[in-house]
């Protein structure tokens, strides 16, 4: 479903956290030019997380990696029936060619597993309703991993005195921040590994109370970051959208802290594609970062240019637009953000697959089928490097119709090439990831 837009006022720094009911000491100060999706706080027992207010504003805090309320995975106890079971919510193809999203529940008892699956599916629908997800759904597999908790609900709901026994130890009032929904990250990893693959991880808590968190962790399983959300709250899905901006798009946060220092120029140009030390004129002159989008109307409102403030600093860094989802929830990705997200999809997924594995020997009596998961993808065929214009756009080819010159027994190479021609990706370096080829030997 689509969300109503939140107010455009952005609370920053301590004000944003204060809106959630917190002790100011929990607020982390600016960190220069880091990639939050891959960052882990220096002391391994704590993680840097993002905190999301109901008004759409975003702040940061550091929290324990372990939950004091964890009751799952206890030595000597057999897991409950159904615990760890994996169910596909959406299966578009083999994991080798897809983005795999893993949705893990917490606070759902054995009798509530049907509710968990409904909540998990709803959160995926909320995430995939946002562009560019909406146009690329078929690049994704979504897996629900069940946990069976001893008690229903989440610690801290409805009040901080409430304690629940749950598999992942999810809890509100983390670091004295009421709406900050923390989790035991090792327990999450122990369940994520049960899925075929984990590129994104979303923890859905059995609560209607608004809250969540965005964890900046890099797992050896391959996922960057964990998003926690309230399964019964229709606004919490936006937390997952923002977090995937980091993990898939490698985007920086575009919000900043009032009263913070100016970004130190000695740190150099940030690596992320959506913040820069330079104004629009300089980016255009240098043909750098989002210069190709400058002057265009952006889906998050306004025109792409250079707006001072971003990467946690109010001065010294610029963002492409006034207020995208990387600055506050309830917004759209801006044009440079959409470009980065699509490129991120294709770092994990491919625009061309086939039920017949590439390299499988074929003969003239075979029929070959390929799949194009994204609408509008162009498809071409070639034989031994020579284009076959008569086959352009065909997803099924009867090899008897393919001219195979030479003597009987000669082996030819048939190649399919697919390209996503989307105008949402302008950078030639990123566009290379939007093309894929598959080849098969064909014997005359």
What name fits each language-model region?
Residues 153-154, 189-198, 204-226:
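Catalytic zinc-binding patch centered on the HExxH motif and its immediate surroundings
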Residues 244-260:
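Catalytic Zn2+-binding segment of zinc metalloproteases
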């Amino acid at each position: 479903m689509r969300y109503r837009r939140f107010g455009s006022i952005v609370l920053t720094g301590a004000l944003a956290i204060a809106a959630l009911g917190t002790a100011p000491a929990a607020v982390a100060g600016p960190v220069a030019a880091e990639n939050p999706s891959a960052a882990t706080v220096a002391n391994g027992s704590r993680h840097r997380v993002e905190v999301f207010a109901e008004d759409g504003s975003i702040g940061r805090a550091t929290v324990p990696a372990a939950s004091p309320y964890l009751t799952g995975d206890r030595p000597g106890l057999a897991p409950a029936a159904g615990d760890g079971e994996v169910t596909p919510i959406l299966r578009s193809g083999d994991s080798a060619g897809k983005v795999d999203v893993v949705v893990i529940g917490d606070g759902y008892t054995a009798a509530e597993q049907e509710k968990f699956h409904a909540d998990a599916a709803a959160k995926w629908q909320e995430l995939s309703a946002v562009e560019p997800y909406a146009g690329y759904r078929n690049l994704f597999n979504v897996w629900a991993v069940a946990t069976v908790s001893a008690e229903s609900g989440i610690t801290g709901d409805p009040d901080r005195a409430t304690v629940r026994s749950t598999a992942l130890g999810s809890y509100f009032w983390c670091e004295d921040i009421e709406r900050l929904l923390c989790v035991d990250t090792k327990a999450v990893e122990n369940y994520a590994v049960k899925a075929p693959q984990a590129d994104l991880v979303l923890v859905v808590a059995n609560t209607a109370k608004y809250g969540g968190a965005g964890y900046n962790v890099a797992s050896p399983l391959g996922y960057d970051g964990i998003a926690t959300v309230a399964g019964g709250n229709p606004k919490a899905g936006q937390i997952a959208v923002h977090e995937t901006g980091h993990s898939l798009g490698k985007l920086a946060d575009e919000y900043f802290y009032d009263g913070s220092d100016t970004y130190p120029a000695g740190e150099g140009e940030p690596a992320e594609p959506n913040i820069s030390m330079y104004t629009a004129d300089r980016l255009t002159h240098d043909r750098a970062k989002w210069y190709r989008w400058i002057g265009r109307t952006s889906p998050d409102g306004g025109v792409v240019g250079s707006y001072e403030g971003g990467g946690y600093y109010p001065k010294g860094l610029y963002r492409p637009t006034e207020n995208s989802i990387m600055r506050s929830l309830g917004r759209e990705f801006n044009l440079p953000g959409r470009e980065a997200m699509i490129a991120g999809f294709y770092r994990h997924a491919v625009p061309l697959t086939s039920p017949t594995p590439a390299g499988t020997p074929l003969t003239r009596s075979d029929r070959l089928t390929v799949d194009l998961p994204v609408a509008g993808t162009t498809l071409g065929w070639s034989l031994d490097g020579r284009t076959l214009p008569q086959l352009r756009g065909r997803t099924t080819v009867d090899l008897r119709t393919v001219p195979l010159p030479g003597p009987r027994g000669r082996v030819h190479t048939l190649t399919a090439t697919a390209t996503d021609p989307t105008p949402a990706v302008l950078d030639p370096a990123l566009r290379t990831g939007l093309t894929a080829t598959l080849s098969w030997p064909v014997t005359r």
